[in-house]
Amino acid sequence: MGRIRVLSDQVANQIAAGEVVDRPASVVKELLENAIDAEATRIRVEVEAGGRKLIRVTDNGIGMMRDDAMLAFERHATSKIRSSDDLLTIATLGFRGEALPSIASISRLEMITRAQGEETGTCIEIAGGKMLRVEDAGAPPGTSFTIRDLFYNTPARRKFLKAESTELSHVSALVTHYALAHPDKHFELHSATHALLNAPPVNEPSERVFQIFGAETLNQLIPMAAERPFDRAGLPEPPPWRRDQDYEPPDPGFLRVKGFISKPALQKLNRNSIYIFINRRLVRDRLILHAITEGYRNIIPPTSFPVALLFLEMPPHEVDVNVHPAKTEVRFRQSSVLHDFLRDSIRNALMKARPAADFLAALSASEPVSSVLPTATPVQDSEVIPAGSEAAGEVAAFALTEPVLPSVEQPLPFARAEMTVPQVQGAAGSAPAPPAYPAVAGAAARVPGGNCGHDAGPEEIPPPGGEAGTLASLASLKPLGQLRESFILAVNDEGFWIIDQHVAHERVLFEKILREREVERVHRQRLLMPLLLDLLPHQMVRFAEIAQELERNGFEAEPFGPHTIAIKASPVGLEGARLERMLVEVLEQTGTGTQSENLETVRTRIAASIACHSAIKINTPLDPQRMEWLLAELARTAHPTSCPHGRPIALRYSWKDIQRAFERI
């Protein structure tokens, strides 16, 4: 007798359940999607013991008649598709017909449903995949699923469940996801003791965000919306001999995105606050996560993550949702188009977070402070300055520190983001609240409107120009001095500022390097003696890959043996040990990705490393003229609130904070 056997339907369903249902949240997901597909406007979810003992999902959708209700528990029975061609135009959340039989095979299930227009409903009870009871039942229109004792007949699966609180948190996160995606529906989530979520229907997504996260989070979010047409190439078309005279090529459709992204000041330690929906379907996709990360590159630290709520809409033929039974993994026909579109849309939204007119007007109205400072003369790529010469000494005094030349009109290879300067906060994670009474003794006496007397009321204090820090406000800063020769103390009508001189100069140099490179006006100096640098094997491989990009940034280097390179010229301001450290850092950083990095990423990393090693260091005294110049140049940058590595540049104590500290208000 043969060794191969055909598995029973019950065993097959339990195996399928391993892919579809791995925890209580998976059950909730499948039942929620069924309710949404059934056009429900109110969905109630109840759980006990984290979903182990009880999961109940009740909706007021279209319901089912008895025959359909019984057939729904057969494998691959569905009302969503009829043929394989329908897979190309799936518009519903469910379509595989696997969820209900899989859930019924590993739990004790009861379903009560009544179709719209029917007088009576149907009650079906199933345990371990065996139908126990089917009878008429009185019920309101809609469907109610009650799942008890999940994994009761598969103890090996049950023991892998986490603590009740952990499982409940997964269920809560899932319901929150769908409540955000469908603001027109009423969602409720209840545990055995209290209500966890009650979100009535609203008209706008922003109202739903307010319901779930509150006003504080909503104020830290930036709305975004963008669209672009898809490329026609690759669309399925019939052969010429099968086309009729009235044949028209298929419309490729549009790619659209709308939603919210967080301001740079709001940062998280993981990706749990990134919500992604494609055609209202919850997905977790690496490509989209990478595009979001790229959109925030050089704006927040690489170890921090933004908050994002993104709804992507595209024609069904552009996305394949039939990749995994859980339907959270998808594939895109034009993945590179989607990635670049989403990355650029995020950057543009950050740029438009506030009107740019105020910043541009401030720049045009202010006289550049840099006109009174010595500057290095720009040279073409072919020109070099011998190290050690008198000219090199003059250039090194302000190496890479001259302002961006007004004649350079080309945009930076990344979008300009205009952001409010954050108040006192950490560099990563959720921004903590500023201290209630910042220590500003000494500087407070020079704040406009300051008064030592306590008899003056708030109405006697001149109002500041505005509470929110803006790009224009940086140009109006007046330096007071330095704190330990590392931080610039400055004031304007908005309040008191502390600026990290190193990261501020780093931001100025970073954007200047990118601009100069775009027009091939790189400053370089030739070394009197070539600098020999020994590299590890993987570093030599990486050097060969980015040698051309290094040359565009002012380096002249070539292999000198199997594990050595000879550096003959370098960007102005980089010499000796700093030059060695910078090159090793670039070779290590650009080689840590799991995939081949794009050219723009390599360029920005090289520019960021050059800027970091060339910038003014801490513990460096600056005269008032140099401080004024640095603040003016910082105001000209696209992202004056963070360095290329995401560290904050400035902390602002607003006028209101200062008044509150001295009990004026």
Curated annotation (Swiss-Prot):
Disulfide bonds: none
GO MF term set: ATP binding; ATP hydrolysis activity; ATP-dependent DNA damage sensor activity; mismatched DNA binding
Entries under NCBIfam families matching the protein: mutl
SMART domains assigned to the protein according to its UniProt record, in alphabetical order: DNA_mis_repair, MutL_C
Identification of the protein by name: DNA mismatch repair protein MutL
Task performed by this protein: This protein is involved in the repair of mismatches in DNA. It is required for dam-dependent methyl-directed DNA mismatch repair. May act as a 'molecular matchmaker', a protein that promotes the formation of a stable complex between two or more DNA-binding proteins in an ATP-dependent manner without itself being part of a final effector complex.
One Pfam family hit: MutL_C
Gene Ontology biological process terms in this record: mismatch repair
Cellular component, GO, one term: mismatch repair complex
Taxonomic lineage of the native organism: Bacteria, Pseudomonadati, Acidobacteriota, Terriglobia, Terriglobales
Cross-referenced InterPro entries: DNA_mismatch_repair_CS, DNA_mismatch_repair_MutL, DNA_mismatch_S5_2-like, HATPase_C_sf, MutL/Mlh/PMS, MutL/Mlh/Pms-like, MutL_C, MutL_C_dimsub
